[in-house]
UniProtKB/Swiss-Prot annotation:
Subunit structure: Part of the 50S ribosomal subunit.
Single biological process term from Gene Ontology: cytoplasmic translation
GO cellular component, one term: cytosolic large ribosomal subunit
Protein name per the record: Large ribosomal subunit protein uL6
Keywords of this entry: Ribonucleoprotein, Ribosomal protein, RNA-binding, rRNA-binding
InterPro entries: Ribosomal_uL6-like, Ribosomal_uL6-like_a/b-dom_sf, Ribosomal_uL6_a/b-dom, Ribosomal_uL6_bac-type, Ribosomal_uL6_CS
The keyword Metal-binding appears for this protein: no
Organism lineage: Bacteria, Pseudomonadati, Pseudomonadota, Alphaproteobacteria, Hyphomicrobiales
Annotated source species: Xanthobacter autotrophicus (strain ATCC BAA-1158 / Py2)
Its biological purpose: This protein binds to the 23S rRNA, and is important in its secondary structure. It is located near the subunit interface in the base of the L7/L12 stalk, and near the tRNA binding site of the peptidyltransferase center.
Length: 177
């Protein structure tokens, strides 16, 4: 039995959830999201809770059960609180700035990297070396953070580059004479 899958998803006040076949739709103060569940999983709304259950007992059913419940829980959390990822930029002359619908990154290349901010995502730069990505869709927020980090990932010798806030970078020792 899945420890995560058997837990019901609480639907707080101000949030409405509806089922349309295999699609779960959630509306809240921050917006609306939906997810389509796989055929192996069934969902039902009981009062102010949404329960996810399996349609069988195979290994695939069990694997999809916990994941589906977490996807639904992320929808509810997204429309109530939202999600946020912070990136830190380390390096001499490395900086970021938001210009209209673009994020302008100076990462030591001969040119600035210009990243178009997708719909549903907000990016702010409280400091030139800090980027805060927020939105209601957890997958999209993580994907945008990963794409920005990929432009210049942290290198192991000096630690220069773009990294997640709180991420540990394994440091290497340089050559010895």
């Amino acid at each position: 039995m899945s420890k995560i899958g058997k837990l019901p998803v609480a639907i707080p006040a101000g949030v409405t959830a509806s089922l349309d076949g295999q699609t779960v739709k959630v509306k809240g103060p921050k917006g609306a999201l939906e997810v389509t569940l796989v055929e192996e999983i069934a969902a039902k709304i009981e009062g102010s809770e949404l329960k996810v259950s399996m349609n069988g007992e195979t290994t695939r059913h069990k694997a999809m059960w916990g994941m589906s419940r977490t996807l639904v829980a992320n929808l509810v959390e997204g429309v109530t609180k939202g999600f946020e990822k912070k990136l830190e930029i380390t390096g001499v002359g490395y900086k970021a700035a938001v210009q209209g619908k673009n994020l302008n990154l100076s990462l030591g290349y001969s040119h600035d990297v210009i990243y178009a901010i997708p719909e549903g995502i907000q990016i702010v730069t409280p400091k030139p070396t800090e980027v805060v990505i927020s939105g209601i869709d957890r997958q999209k927020v993580g994907q945008v953070a990963a794409e920005i980090r990929e432009f210049r990932g942290p290198e192991p010798y000096k630690g220069k580059g773009v990294k997640y806030a709180g991420e540990f970078i394994f440091r290497k020792e340089g050559k010895k004479k």
